[in-house]
């Protein structure tokens, strides 16, 4: 748990509920969340999937390394994925990525993606365009800047997308 997530009640709550029940709980630190100098690729599948896959692999390696020590823990064949909001999106993206790209490495027992923005082009965009006012005015620019940075690089000219006051 990073310094950022250690102060997050939801992160601590999930850890406190699942770990004493015998589950190995892995909470990935997505790109840009624990490091303010990096942008977070919000609702972009590949970086989320990569973070989850690498975290699971790392914990599996640690289990093997600690096999003969007093700190050992045991993996079984069950893999549960769960997430809420951006984590819900990450859960569904990771499930899809694991099933398509790593079918021999990961077998998912159950997946619980909750309250994530799953269907941007089919649901979210038409909704945003139909509303005269959106209650969370930061959200659309957050999604847009995330996608621009990820797909076009950090030298994006935001003046092409926003009024000059907001582009600066």
Where are these regions (language model features)?
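Alpha-helix capping and helix-loop boundary segments enriched in small/acidic/polar residues
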Residues: 2-9, 39-47, 82-86
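Extracytoplasmic/secreted envelope proteins and their assembly/folding machinery
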Residues: 15, 49, 53-56, 91-95
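Short beta-to-alpha linker loops that shape the active-site pocket of alpha/beta-hydrolase fold enzymes
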Residues: 29-33
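Primarily recognizes the serine-hydrolase "nucleophile elbow" in alpha/beta-hydrolase
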Residues: 58-134
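Alpha/beta-hydrolase active-site loop
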Residues: 42-67
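Accessory cap/linker subdomain of secreted extracellular hydrolases
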Residues: 114-168
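Short, surface-exposed "cap/lid" segments of acyl-processing enzymes
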Residues: 1-22, 35-36
């Amino acid at each position: 748990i990073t310094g950022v997530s250690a102060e997050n009640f939801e992160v601590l709550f999930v850890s406190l509920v699942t770990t004493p029940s015998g589950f190995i709980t892995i909470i990935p630190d997505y790109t840009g969340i624990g490091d303010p100098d990096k942008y977070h690729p919000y609702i972009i599948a590949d970086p989320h999937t990569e973070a989850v896959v690498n975290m699971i692999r790392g914990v599996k390696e640690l289990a093997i390394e600690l096999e003969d020590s007093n700190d050992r823990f045991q993996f079984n064949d069950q893999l549960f994925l769960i997430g809420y909001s951006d984590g819900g999106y990450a859960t569904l993206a990771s499930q899809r990525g694991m099933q398509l790209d790593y079918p021999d490495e990961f077998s998912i027992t159950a997946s619980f993606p909750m309250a994530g923005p799953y269907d941007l082009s089919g649901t979210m965009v038409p909704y945003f365009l139909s509303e005269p006012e959106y209650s969370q005015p930061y959200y659309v620019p957050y999604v847009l800047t995330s996608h621009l940075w990820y797909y076009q690089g950090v030298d994006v000219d935001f003046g092409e997308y926003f009024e000059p006051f907001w582009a600066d």
